[in-house]
């Protein structure tokens, strides 16, 4: 899978509510009502990611969960990352 160009990534961003492009990855931080709500969201995203064999980096800080997407094997953001960002929005809400 090819790394997307800057133009392709910029074109995808308006459809990725809550996501930003930072440090070569797509990132979204979400503050949940409680720690356990955040953990539940991580579990749901993890199950979906496992089924797609495309796994986000996930950072958990009390009620704030940050998802980061980059295809490490390709060295950048690919269509799989854009698709997974959309999927995560569908799972946790945009």
Swiss-Prot record:
Keywords for this protein: Lyase
EC number, as in UniProt: 4.2.1.96
InterPro entries assigned to the protein according to its UniProt record, in alphabetical order: PCD_sf (IPR036428), Pterin_deHydtase (IPR001533)
TM spans (from-to): none
Recorded catalytic activity of this chain's protein: (4aS,6R)-4a-hydroxy-L-erythro-5,6,7,8-tetrahydrobiopterin = (6R)-L-erythro-6,7-dihydrobiopterin + H2O
Gene3D superfamilies attached to this UniProt entry: Transcriptional coactivator/pterin dehydratase
GO biological process, one term: tetrahydrobiopterin biosynthetic process
Any one GO molecular-function label of the UniProt entry: 4-alpha-hydroxytetrahydrobiopterin dehydratase activity
Family listed: Belongs to the pterin-4-alpha-carbinolamine dehydratase family.
HAMAP family reported in the protein's UniProt record: Pterin_4_alpha
Name recorded for this polypeptide: Putative pterin-4-alpha-carbinolamine dehydratase
């Amino acid at each position: 899978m090819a790394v997307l160009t800057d133009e392709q990534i910029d074109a995808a961003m308006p459809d990725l509510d809550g996501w930003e492009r930072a440090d070569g990855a797509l990132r979204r931080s979400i503050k949940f009502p409680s720690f356990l709500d955040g953990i539940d969201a991580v579990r749901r995203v993890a199950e979906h990611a496992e089924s797609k064999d495309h796994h986000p980096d996930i950072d958990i800080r009390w009620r704030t969960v940050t998802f980061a997407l980059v295809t490490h094997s390709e060295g950048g953001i690919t269509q799989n990352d854009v698709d997974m960002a959309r999927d995560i929005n569908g799972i946790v809400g945009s």
